[in-house]
Amino acid sequence: MKFAILFGGNSYEHEISIVSAVVLKKVINQNLEFVFCDEERRFYHIPSEKMNSKTFSTKAYKNEKELFIKQGGFFSKGFLKENKLECECVINLIHGRDGEDGKIAALFEFYSIKFIGPRLEASVLSFNKELTKLYAKSVGVKTLDYTMLRKNQNSKEKLSFPCIIKPARLGSSIGISIVKDEKDLEYAKDVGFEFDNDLVVEEFKNNIKEYNLAGCMINDEFVFSIIEEPKKKEFLDFEQKYLSFSGHNELIEADLSEELKEKLKDSFKKIYNPLFKGALIRCDFFILDNEVYLNEINPNPGSLANYLFKDFNTTLNALADQISLEKMIKINYNFLHSINGQKGKL
């Protein structure tokens, strides 16, 4: 199957998305097309040989062919006709806003474009950490207790320290602060509110373990990656998260009991099915006192979490093969014709 990778977007995670696409180019062993969405949300067709950081940092991409989107795919303007970008399935690799908040999903569904990525409802629930917690609770998956802080509202909630403060609609550890006592609270809130009007506050637990599990559903069967235990300090910062997947070191599966592995997989299944069908996602979990808690859902994980899979290419192609487009409704205007044929026309 021929894929096009869509990356970039008007997002704080724009550059991360570029890194993801460059890494994935080295991983997918078949012919690829690359569609870059710049900060103005204009699409460009990037030749494979120009998929490098310089193309984007110098804005040389603007010299490439501009694309537009319409029913059935991406097109460029030719001398006499429009030329369709040849691909069978688009991989949504835009991180954060645009790619994970539902905009791209809605656009692709509206224009009947086959794609790998979260659909609209899944995007909405996974992009907002508060909604993610409510969704997890509804399907029987635990999350850590939390408090919400709203911009321009004086919260009367008494916070416990240390705590961790996160923007509700941002990933990649951007805007996150660990607050060890009250004197650091206002600064952490100011940092968070630079990125979002809503902040999630959780108690920071030193003895907690974090594990990542990626997967998808193919023909009603789950395909899982290995379970990863991230190497970290207090929490994963920007560079730990997004430079780590650009390396080539072979990962070793986390040393966990079979009971805990099954608990993680069971929680993943509850989160994934049926909302995330058509997407390859990564769930980040906490384990505390032998209990599993969902930390967050990554609906478009960095480089699609390829490094966690033993046979990523087979998984990706099998996932794409079973994705179907929404059935179009045929409009015949019979009702309007019937009105038109009567006295007192509409």
Swiss-Prot record:
Residue positions binding Mg(2+) 1: 284, 296
Cofactor: Mg(2+); Mn(2+)
Transferase is among the record's keywords: no
Every ATP-grasp domain range: 133-327
EC number(s) from the headed UniProt entry: 6.3.2.4
Pathway, per record: Cell wall biogenesis; peptidoglycan biosynthesis
UniProt GO MF annotations: ATP binding; D-alanine-D-alanine ligase activity; metal ion binding
Cofactor note (record): Binds 2 magnesium or manganese ions per subunit.
Protein's UniProt keywords contain Chloroplast: no
Keyword terms: ATP-binding, Cell shape, Cell wall biogenesis/degradation, Cytoplasm, Ligase, Magnesium, Manganese, Metal-binding, Nucleotide-binding, Peptidoglycan synthesis
Record's subcellular location: Cytoplasm
Pfam family, one: Dala_Dala_lig_N
Binding-site residues for Mg(2+) 2, renumbered to this chain: 296, 298
GO cellular component assignments: cytoplasm
InterPro entries: ATP-grasp, ATP_grasp_subdomain_1, D-Ala_lig_Van_CS, D_ala_D_ala, Dala_Dala_lig_C, Dala_Dala_lig_N, PreATP-grasp_dom_sf
Enzyme class, broadest EC rank: ligase
A GO biological process held by the record: cell wall organization
Coiled-coil portions: none
Catalytic activity reported: 2 D-alanine + ATP = D-alanyl-D-alanine + ADP + phosphate + H(+)
Binding site for ATP: 159-211
Organism domain of life: Bacteria
Alphabetized HAMAP family for the sequence: Dala_Dala_lig
Role: Cell wall formation.
Family membership: Belongs to the D-alanine--D-alanine ligase family.
Descriptive protein name: D-alanine--D-alanine ligase
Organism annotation: Campylobacter jejuni subsp. jejuni serotype O:6 (strain 81116 / NCTC 11828)
Recorded name of the encoding gene: ddl
